[in-house]
Structures are given as structure tokens and as C-alpha cells.
Amino acid sequence: MAIRGRPRRAEADAEILDAALAMLREGGYRALSLDEVARRAGTAKSSIYRRWASKAALAAEVVRREVPAPEGEVAAAFEALMNGPFGGVIASLIGEAQESAETRSMVLDLLAPYRVAGDDVLGPILFRRLLND
């Protein structure tokens, strides 16, 4: 079966993610605009939507790319994550997850490496982070 449409540029993913990363660092999740990401990446907004279904999906992918998977003690790794440069983005995604099942699923997937069966280490750390924002 032939692929229709223009072929995807391999470097476009990185350009889009780099533009989104810059915006998240500049103003956090609320400042992330797909129109502006497209402008900065030199691509069409539709190209972003072909790769990521939503603003939340793009932000989650940036966090996934930029934040290493936890090693060692999960609570310490999660605390470092929430107090690091992406803590505010993750807190915003968690807020968005209250309104959207799709975002909730992405957040659960994003935080899965920090979950320990039978051990609620995330709750108190996350609660403190949300109170500080």
C-alpha cells in the first residue's frame, strides 16, 4: 500500500519537540501554544496534530524525552522530578487530567515509572508540589 501525502521529515519531530521545550521552559504549560510551536519549528500546525493528538500529548512527550527514567529510590526520584524544571508542567498536566480522560491516561502513563505497588510515595510529594505552585 502506498503512503499518501507528503513524506514525514524525520527531523521534524525533534524540531517540534525542541520548540515545545523552549516554550515550556519560558512560560510553563499554560503558555504552550501549538500555533507558536508550529511557527518556531517551521512547520504547519497540522503536522503537530499528525504526531500528537493534543497540547497535553505534546507536553507529555517533551517531559518523557527530557526527564530520565527514575533509578534507585522512587520517592527521591519523583521528588527530584517535581522540584525540577518540569515539575510545573507535570502539575499542569495533572490539573488538565481532571477534565480529560485522554490527558489522565497520558499522565498515568508518564508517571508509571514512579509508582511502586502498594507504596503511596507519590501522593504526599505531589500534594506538597501542588500546594507550592
Residue ranges and their predicted role:
Residues W52, V62-V63:
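DNA major-groove recognition helix of helix-turn-helix
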Residues R51-A53, L126-F127:
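Tryptophan-centric aromatic hotspots in well-structured domains and transmembrane helices
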Residues M82-L122:
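Amphipathic alpha-helical packing segments from all-alpha helical-bundle domains
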